Amino acid sequence: MKNKIVELIKNSLAKLEIDGVDIHVETPKNTDNGDFSSNVAMQLTRVLRKNPRVIAEEIISNIEEDEAVEKIEIAGPGFINFFVKKSSLGSVVGKILEDDFKYGENNIGQGKKVLLEYVSANPTGTLHVGHARNAAYSDSLARIMKKSGYDLSREYYINDAGNQINNLVISAIVRYKQALGMDAEMPDDAYHGEDIKVLGQKLKDEFGESLLEREDLNEFIREYAVAYEMENIKKDLGDFGLEYDVFFSEKSLYENGLVDKALESLREQGFVYEKDGALWLETTALGTGDDKDRVLIKADGSLTYLTSDIAYHKNKLDRGFDLLLDVLGADHHGYVARLKASVVAMGYKADQLEALIMQMVQLLNNGEVVKMSKRTGKAITLRDLIDEVGADAARYFLVMRSADSHLDFDFAVAKEQSSDNPLYYVQYAHARICSILRQAAEQAEYDVKNCDYELLTDEYSVDLLKNLAYYPEIVAQAAKNYEPHRICNYLQSLASSFHKFYNNNKVITENKEQTQSYLALITAAKITLRNALDLIGVSAPGKM
C-alpha cells in the first residue's frame, strides 16, 4: 500500500511537470493523521517558492482516484495525509499467504556487495558477554541485510599473529608442564583462564612428555593452541545460531606478503613519513577526523596492530566489496578514524568503510548486578548465557537495544514465563495462533486463501492488518540503518496487536465465512511473527 501511495504522488508530480523528487511516505503514530503521510509539499517549498499548503493542494488535486484510498487531507504546515479504506487493508493477508517465507523481502540493497566482519575475538580464551552482544546483533543484521537485497558475506578475522599469541603459547606450555607434574610458574601477563588449564591437560593426555623433546615446541604449540581455541569459539558461536562464510587468518597476511604490499601502497600514495626512527601514516591529512598521525613501524622494527589491520582492509577491498562493515567493541571507538584514514590513503573512499560500535552489557538478576558466574566463579561467558537462559532469550535480549545504547540484561526477566518477558510475550502470540489453527482444523475444513477481506473491518482486525502491512518497510529500514533492534520493537507491536485482537474477537464461530476470514488473518500474523523472529535468529514455537 505504501508503494501505491508513492506512485500516486509521483504521478501527480508528473502532471505538474515536477521530477527528481525523493518522495518520503511515513506511517503516522497518531491514526488521526491517516494511515500514511508525506512531507513532499514541504520538500518542494524552496524549489517552487510557494506556501507548502498551496503546493499540497495542487498535488492532491492531481492525484488520480484510487479505490483503496478513502480520503486525502492536508495537515499542519503541509503534510499530505492518506486515509485508506478499511476494506482494502485486507489485501495484505493474501500477499502474506502467497509470499509465506518470502514476506518481508525487499531490494533496498540492490545487490550491493558488503563484507560484514564481526566478533573476531582473539583466539586466547572463551567468548565473554560483550562478544555475545556483538554476535547476536551482527548475525541478526546479516540476516536482515540478506533479506533486503544485499550481496553480503559474513567474516571472522582470526587474530593469530602478534604478541597475544606469544602469550598464549607461553601460557599453554606452562599449563602443559604443570599437567605433567613439573614445577612451572604462570607469568602475570599470561592467560589464566580455565580453558588454558584444559588445554594443558589435553596436551599431556595426547602427547605425554614427548613434546618436551621437540625443537619446534613453540611453533607446534602455537598452531595447536590457536586451533583448540578457535574450535571452542566456533562451537559456542554455532550453538548461538551463528554461521560464517569466511574465517580469515591474520597470520596469512604476513605469509602471503600482503602486509608488505599494503605498506608499499601507502608509500606510493605519499601518505607515510619517517620520524624518530619510526614509519608514520599521516592520518591527520586524510580528512577522517583522526587527531594525530599513527605509527606503522616502530623504531625497533616491529609493526603496530594498525599495520596488519590496514593490510587486512586492503585485502577486503581488493576482493571487490563495495562496503566494509566492521562491528567493533566499545573500546575501539577511537580506532575508526585511523582505519578510515588508511582506506583513503590506499586510494579508496572513506565511506567504503563503516563501523558499528557495540556498547557495554550489564548483567542483572532481579535488578542486582551480576559480575561472576555462580558455576565457575569467573566472568560470565557466552556459554554461561546460553546455559542460563537459552540461546533464544540471550539473542533476543541482546538485540533489543540499539548498538550505541548500553544494555541491561536481567536473567530473571529473561526466564520469566509472563508478559513481563518480551520474548515470551512474542513467542506466546505465535504459539497461541498455532493452537487456534489446530483447534479449527479439528472442527471443520477452512480455506484461508479463499476468504472475504471485507469481513476484517472491526477495530482490532484493522489494527492487526496495519501492523502486518508495515513489516516489509520495517525490514528495509532495519537493513538500511543497520538497526536490527527495530525488528524486536516491531515484534512487540505485532504481538500486542494480535493479543488485543484475540481478547476482543472470537475467532472460531458458527459463521463459517467470518471464521475463515479471521483464520486467514491470524495465519498471516503467524507467518509474519515467524519471519521476524527468524531475522534475529530466534525460534517460533508451535506450543508453549
Language-model region placement:
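Short, charged, solvent-exposed linker or helix-capping segments at domain edges/interfaces
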Residues: 91-96
